[in-house]
């Protein structure tokens, strides 16, 4: 915590100057009173912010979708509809609007709110994280939506969907993605019943749904939910399924889905499936027809995007929580041991380098302006290009 006035366990989003890492401002939120059922202790913020047109959008630990002015209060202005921030110093965040998903749509987050926002046009999309209660049996809020769309300027609710209903296996921690498939702008999100669904981006009309579990998987512990973010590539949707990392390792599945189909496309939309993979919470990276897909057991799989043929598998020897980055002919991937491996892109396995950051790497590297930014559990690094 950079502000000595803020003490104790909190969820905090910090802003730093890109050029030299100087701390600028932070958005600090107290933990929810309900405790670990909604807001697991000492886990901070699990949402990655989206930056667009001078605004940072993210989901706080309190289940709020928040829009923040990137300038904070350093510009001498209190922007937006929220004017009652408790502190308005230059190191405080300037809140433009907030949408409380617990209050407004009745969401009941399980353990953490974990969605990273995505935008399309005037709308912003997030998962509500609605899930089971502490019993891991009951759904306290079965009518709450799984996905919502808000006006990104005002925070007004535009549409919602609850196709999951009361079939949530555990929690809902995936993030939506947006893509144009067959000429139709779609919002796509994996959900807590193990199904992935696609919606018309503007209206929220459900276009299709696909079950990522074998039909003989009928009991909750034999079905995987979806935590990763889907990727759209050449009119196909790619995603791997998994479970809460606390459940450990297990059998997973990865799919290529033809999302030009409609309604239940579990059979008609399946292009290929890849079963030699363990449970995964990672989003694939796709480059020049090759998929780089990690699993939670520590393996990185290189797969042909058209056929599902596997070219190689690299063992990192540690659990993988984050997702790979492909840039300049290289694949970057961190693991729970704090190692970051760099591999050459292509159908032949070649490890270029490996370094250790001193503590676990749970996030995904981000490139910008000739540098690579990545964080370990307790540090943020900016690495210069060679």
Question: What residue spans do the PLM features occupy?
Answer:
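Noncatalytic, solvent-exposed loop/strand surfaces
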Residues: 1-386
């Amino acid at each position: 915590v950079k502000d000595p006035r803020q003490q104790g366990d909190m969820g905090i989003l910090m802003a730093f100057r890109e050029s030299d890492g100087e701390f600028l401002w932070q958005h600090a939120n107290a933990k929810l009173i309900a405790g670990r059922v909604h807001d697991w202790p000492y886990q901070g913020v699990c949402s990655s912010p989206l930056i667009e047109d001078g605004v940072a959008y993210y989901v706080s630990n309190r289940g709020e979708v928040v829009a923040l002015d990137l300038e904070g209060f350093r510009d001498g202005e209190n922007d937006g509809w929220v004017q009652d921030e408790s502190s308005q110093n230059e190191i405080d965040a300037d809140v433009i609007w907030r949408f409380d998903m617990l209050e407004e749509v009745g969401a009941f987050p399980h353990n953490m709110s974990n969605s990273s926002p995505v935008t399309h046009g005037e709308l912003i999309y997030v998962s509500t994280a609605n899930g089971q209660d502490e019993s891991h049996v009951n759904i306290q809020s079965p009518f709450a939506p799984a996905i919502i769309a808000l006006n990104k300027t005002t925070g007004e609710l535009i549409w919602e969907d609850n196709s999951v209903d009361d079939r949530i296996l555990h929690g809902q921690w995936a993030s939506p993605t947006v893509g144009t498939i067959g000429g139709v702008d779609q919002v796509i999100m994996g959900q807590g019943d193990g199904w992935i669904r696609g919606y018309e981006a503007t209206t929220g009309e459900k276009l299709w749904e696909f079950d990522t579990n074998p039909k003989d998987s009928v009991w909750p512990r034999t079905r995987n939910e979806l935590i990763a973010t889907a990727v759209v590539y050449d009119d196909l949707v790619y995603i791997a399924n998994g479970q809460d990392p606390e459940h450990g390792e297990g059998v997973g599945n990865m799919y290529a889905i033809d999302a030009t189909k409609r309604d239940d496309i579990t059979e008609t939309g399946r292009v290929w499936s890849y079963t030699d993979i363990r449970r995964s919470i990672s989003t694939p990276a796709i480059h020049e027809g090759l998929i780089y897909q990690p699993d939670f057991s520590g393996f990185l799989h290189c797969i042909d995007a058209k056929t599902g043929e596997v070219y190689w598998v690299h063992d990192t020897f540690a659990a993988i929580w984050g997702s790979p980055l492909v840039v300049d002919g290289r694949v970057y991937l961190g693991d729970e041991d704090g190692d970051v491996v760099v591999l050459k892109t292509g159908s032949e396995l070649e490890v270029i380098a490996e370094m250790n950051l001193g503590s676990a790497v749970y996030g995904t590297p981000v490139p910008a302006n000739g540098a690579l930014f990545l964080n370990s559990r307790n540090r943020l690094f900016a690495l210069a290009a060679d």
